[in-house]
Structures are given as structure tokens and as C-alpha cells.
A protein has these predicted regions:
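C-terminal transmembrane helix and the adjacent membrane-cytosol boundary/short C-terminal tail
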Residues: 63-64, 127, 131, 143, ...
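Periplasmic/extracellular loop-to-transmembrane helix junction in inner-membrane transport proteins
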Residues: 3-45
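Loop-to-helix entry region at the N-terminal start of transmembrane alpha-helices
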Residues: 33-41, 93-121, 161, 205, ...
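Short cytoplasmic-facing helical segments at TM-TM junctions of multi-pass membrane proteins
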Residues: 125-164, 190, 194
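Faces of alpha-helical transmembrane segments in polytopic inner-membrane proteins
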Residues: 52, 56, 81-89, 109-127, ...
Length: 241
């Protein structure tokens, strides 16, 4: 749990007195629609970014210099992917219509921008994940008759999965936070509850947006933790030793 999440979580009970359930009941359909929009805009870019990043990360991890270090091209790739994440989200959201030719309020701007952020995070996580698998294991698998594809699919990916899934957790929670910024340019999400609540001085609207954003982050993070345990059962066995 991040420091910001901890602060917000501890503040929610203090602000509960400002929450009016009548407002929640009257606006239930709108809240559900914004929640689904938020979930879609957060999850789809993670899937797209990860799918694009993993082949790049694997290639970068396997490209080693003769002494075991990284080649200049690989270092440049990692630097550029890290640099992408330093671009402020609101600036990238505003830049997207110029690049894509879309409307400023199109959800596609948020989807593409967050796919870029997810890609940059997952390239770094993927390289670290594949680097964590010793080359000797891959070479042993090849010596036993595994094809390169079988060695990657049955050895490299399962052993790299814990680090990859940790990267997915970071990317997912980060996207849930950044989707809200899209409300500033008119893209509907739970962030719309923040902007509308502030503009119309409706504390209930703000509190619902905060609570649902936090809840979504906790639920998705928990699901990814569960997925990690399911896909890597040997780690639980190692911890019990």
C-alpha cells in the first residue's frame, strides 16, 4: 500500500459524515457507468502495454555484451522507456489528439497514453524478470532437446512470472490513479466525480470517487497477488521450508 493510499484510507472515516446515501442512491446508475469506464481505461492499457513490452524485454535481456554487461543499444532502450514515464500524464493526454487526430475528449487519448506508460513500466520489469533466470538453465534446456520456443514458454516465462506480475501490479495501480486525471480534459471516469464534486460543492460525490478508486486499486492488486500465487505454486513451497 502506498503512502497516499494509506492517508486517504485513514481519512475516509473522518469524512464519512459528509457522505449522504440519498445522493448515492439517486446517482447509482451514473456511478456504475463511471466505475466501468474507469476500470476499462485502467486495465486495457496494462494489457496492451504488457503485450508489447514482453517481446522487447526478452530481446533486450538476451542481448548481452561479451563480458555479460548490457550492449549500448539495450541501455538506450531502457533509458528511453524509463524517460517515457517521466512525461506528466496531463501533458500526454493533451498531446494525444495532435498525434492521433482524435477529439480532445475522446477516451482513446487516455487509452493510448496509459498504454505508453504501461509499456515503459513493463519493459523495465520484463528485463529484470528475464535477467533473473540464469542463462545456464536455458542452455541446459536446449541441451535436453527443448526447442528455443519450448525453452522460453516452459522455462523462461514461468520462472520470470513473479517479477513480471509484480510489474503488472505496479502498472495497474498507477493506471487507476492516472485515469482520474483524464477527467480534467473531459474523459468520463471516477475522476469526473472529483471534478464535478469540487465544482458543485458536493462532498458526497468526491468521497464516492475516492472510495471507489481505492477499492478498485485494492481489488485488482489483490487479484493479481492471487494470480501470482496460482501461477507460481513453487514459491509457496519454498517459503514453507
Amino acid at each position: 500500500m502506498s503512502v497516499l493510499q494509506s492517508v486517504l484510507l485513514s481519512a475516509l472515516p473522518l469524512a464519512a459524515g459528509d457522505l449522504h446515501w440519498e445522493w448515492v442512491a439517486d446517482n447509482g446508475r451514473r456511478i456504475l457507468e463511471l466505475t466501468l469506464n474507469h476500470l476499462y481505461q485502467a486495465v486495457v492499457p496494462v494489457a496492451v502495454g504488457a503485450a508489447l513490452a514482453m517481446p522487447v524485454a526478452y530481446y533486450a535481456s538476451r542481448r548481452r555484451a561479451s563480458k555479460g554487461g548490457r550492449r549500448p543499444g539495450t541501455l538506450t532502450l531502457l533509458y528511453l522507456s524509463s524517460l517515457l514515464y517521466t512525461i506528466p500524464s496531463i501533458a500526454l493526454f493533451v498531446l494525444m489528439p495532435l498525434v492521433l487526430g482524435t477529439s480532445i475528449i475522446s477516451p482513446m487519448n487516455v487509452l493510448v497514453a496509459l498504454s505508453v506508460y504501461s509499456f515503459s513500466l513493463m519493459v523495465r520489469a520484463g528485463v529484470d524478470a528475464f535477467d533473473s533466470v540464469p542463462d545456464s538453465l536455458y542452455e541446459s534446456a536446449r541441451a535436453l532437446g527443448y526447442t528455443p520456443g519450448q525453452a522460453r514458454r516452459e522455462l523462461m516465462v514461468p520462472l520470470a512470472a513473479p517479477v513480471i506480475l509484480s510489474g503488472l501490479r505496479v502498472a495497474t495501480v498507477s493506471n487507476i490513479a492516472m485515469v482520474s486525471v483524464g477527467a480534467l480534459i473531459g474523459v468520463p471516469s471516477l475522476g469526473t466525480l472529483f471534478t464535478d464534486g469540487l465544482a458543485r460543492d458536493i462532498p458526497s460525490e468526491i468521497l464516492v470517487g475516492v472510495a471507489l478508486s481505492l477499492g478498485m486499486a485494492f481489488v485488482l492488486d489483490g487479484l493479481l497477488m492471487l494470480l501470482t500465487r496460482i501461477l507460481t505454486p513453487w514459491r509457496a513451497a519454498e517459503r514453507r521450508r
